[in-house]
């Protein structure tokens, strides 16, 4: 046994030096000899230490991926395309600290920032308890991921055991190196397809039910955060050092005091990008002080204390074959480039955006030309210009003079082309109806794009208000509509008449107004009439509404056809209403609340929204600052921690009693 333990200790030490410190202390051949000897001894003695390097590679094929809930949400980051946006982020953090310190006796430290590489692999979340790896999961939705515990054990530098005995979740990125990709593609089996890029190599490995195949990819990982911990740390840099002390390979970082230092760090990372063994697509800038980060909080989508600066996307060239003109919900006619298929960042691209005719002329883009193609944010293909190596004939791109769908005359507003035939232009009407009926809007259950197309083509629906004139008999004349389906849709349409004001505002399809903006407008103006009459200057006073959005709202309600459509909706019984939460009477007002376990009457999103409507601050973990924990079935560690800290625990039934008591 002692020989086995000695070999495990040595091999883990060698792996740590190789993968974490990037400083090999034995030759590969020597390591392989020791590894084979350990494997032989384990087979002979049937003694297995879970921390043995032989336990990294599984030999099983799983049936399916199980869903798993993360203890805390794994957030995505806000993106910056320009250095000015990074500077604005830094200034925002500085201003926040200054304003906070003016009104609080306990002062926050001057902002420091930690700059790290933005890794381009597959995000993983690894849970440890009592020093053992107990679960690994993909990021998934940020709240629910897929269990990849067995797959993660093939990651060459992921510790199966650590010294720290508490409970932690480690957040990082699984990566395939350039050498591993080259080796994999050089040793393909018959009929196997070569891997196209590093990110897909990593993602495909961890989402493979065949663990042997996962192991072939020889993945590594870098870690950069604790998504959950019972350890008290004051700085983000302390988190990184703690991770390193536990044997995790951490991402390289720089501590910066101001924008100039951050700018230099960004440039330094950009210079080494191409020489790295793994892919990065930018730089992450994050506040170092954890308490300041907590106080800054989150938007709907991302933390306010961090931002990702994106590097310029990779480019390639291809031939532009043709241009297709498509009509959107607003009537805007958008050009789309049809391309000679080309591989870009591991994806075959056949189409790309052209923005508008002014952009086409400015870039001198022509049919038949060879063009520079870029994937903005490595997602959306965009034509950046033409090359000098175009061969053969080229042809000017001409703007259409009539709508390609309905034949109506086109008008130009600014740089964009519009079809003003809102009544009988199929794409406009169908997309408008689908948007109006969508879940975040009027929430008409059972409504689909196919239904909208039939309503337009067979029932001659020419406006949103026509939805409320449809009869059951008319619906039954459509394809696949029988008695029950027709009745259900009629009932859903009728039910939608009683709607929340923010849903109604969003359903109208006001340019540049999403659901959050619609909600902000309702909170500010309280009624639809007030929103409709709001001036440009009143609108820009609303948080997060700038000049472009304000102008869109004013211009929208000025239109005679919009006024007519709204009046028809109201005459047909649509009654949007706004109910302001009386948070002052709620026992949860300004209280920090954590919900845990499975609740009978609420999803995670619903309980969060309910608590926020009652004035509560919803947290993802239990601490001394937590006022209440709402515990459902299988509450787990959060419940245990609440008991240990003496936090007041509410059952779902008690929670609802408290709500009812203040009505």
Swiss-Prot record:
SMART domains per the UniProt record, alphabetical: BRCT, HhH1, LIGANc
PROSITE patterns reported in the protein's UniProt record: BRCT (PS50172), DNA_LIGASE_N2 (PS01056)
Catalytic activity: NAD(+) + (deoxyribonucleotide)n-3'-hydroxyl + 5'-phospho-(deoxyribonucleotide)m = (deoxyribonucleotide)n+m + AMP + beta-nicotinamide D-nucleotide
Cofactor(s) the protein requires to work: Mg(2+); Mn(2+)
Annotated BRCT domain residues: 583-663
Gene3D superfamilies per the UniProt record, alphabetical: 5' to 3' exonuclease, C-terminal subdomain, BRCT domain, DNA ligase/mRNA capping enzyme, Helix hairpin bin, Nucleic acid-binding proteins
Coiled coil feature spans: none
Example GO biological process: DNA repair
Classification via CDD domains: BRCT_DNA_ligase_like, LIGANc
Keywords linked to the UniProt accession: DNA damage, DNA repair, DNA replication, Ligase, Magnesium, Manganese, Metal-binding, NAD, Zinc
Gene Ontology, cellular component aspect: cytosol
Active site: 118
Function: DNA ligase that catalyzes the formation of phosphodiester linkages between 5'-phosphoryl and 3'-hydroxyl groups in double-stranded DNA using NAD as a coenzyme and as the energy source for the reaction. It is essential for DNA replication and repair of damaged DNA.
The family this protein is said to belong to: Belongs to the NAD-dependent DNA ligase family. LigA subfamily.
HAMAP family for this protein: DNA_ligase_A
Protein name: DNA ligase 1
Provenance organism: Clostridium acetobutylicum (strain ATCC 824 / DSM 792 / JCM 1419 / IAM 19013 / LMG 5710 / NBRC 13948 / NRRL B-527 / VKM B-1787 / 2291 / W)
